[in-house]
């Protein structure tokens, strides 16, 4: 089984928590679905470097990923950029979004880094809509009828990742 490192830069505690949760949940999902890659928070190569980028609006529900792959589509290195601050508009005004929302965004970008380029459905949808919880801990992102977390990959995404990492 291949291992890919995830190096968290100076991204603040909110993103650090979300990225750690994304790594853990993706590893569980990959294992359950037979995708033979594991994300590790230390010591592995190839490496996904994660940092925040003030150019990405906190109102957006996305990050930016650039990745270099070999001829077979396997990762050599990647750079994931996330918004510095993630916000949600509520009836009481704008507030910081919960860790669950940040986890979904981080996981989406990590899967892009692993070679999944297209946007389709579930975690890899092009459009993710904010779902405000009663409090920040309940915030989710929705792709069609699928609300996350927990993270979910479509059958197409699973097959694509299996093809890259088999």
Task: Give each language-model segment a name.
Residues 6, 10-13, 35, 44, ...:
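Intrinsically disordered, low-complexity regions
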Residues 16-113, 117-120:
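Metzincin-family zinc-dependent endopeptidase catalytic domain
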Residues 1-21:
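Fold-level signature of zinc-dependent metallopeptidase catalytic domains
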Residues 76-93, 100-101, 117-166:
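Metalloprotease/metallohydrolase-associated module, dominated by Zn2+-dependent proteases
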Residues 2, 46-48, 156:
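Residue-level marker of intrinsically disordered, low-complexity segments enriched
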């Amino acid at each position: 089984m291949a291992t890919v490192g995830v190096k968290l830069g100076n991204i603040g505690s909110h993103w650090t928590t979300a990225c750690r949760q994304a790594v853990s949940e993706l590893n569980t999902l990959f294992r359950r679905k037979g995708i033979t890659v594991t994300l590790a928070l230390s010591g592995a190569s190839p490496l996904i470097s994660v940092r925040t980028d003030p150019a990405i609006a906190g109102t957006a529900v996305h990050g930016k990923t650039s990745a270099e792959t070999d001829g077979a589509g396997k990762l050599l290195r990647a750079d994931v950029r996330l918004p510095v601050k993630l916000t949600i508009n509520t009836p009481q005004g704008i507030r910081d979004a919960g860790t669950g929302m940040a986890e979904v965004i981080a996981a989406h970008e990590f899967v892009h880094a692993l070679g999944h380029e297209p946007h389709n459905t579930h975690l890899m949808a092009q459009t993710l809509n904010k779902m405000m919880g009663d409090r920040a801990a309940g915030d989710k992102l929705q792709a069609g009828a699928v609300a996350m977390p927990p993270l979910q990959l479509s059958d197409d995404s699973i097959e694509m990742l299996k093809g890259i990492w088999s």
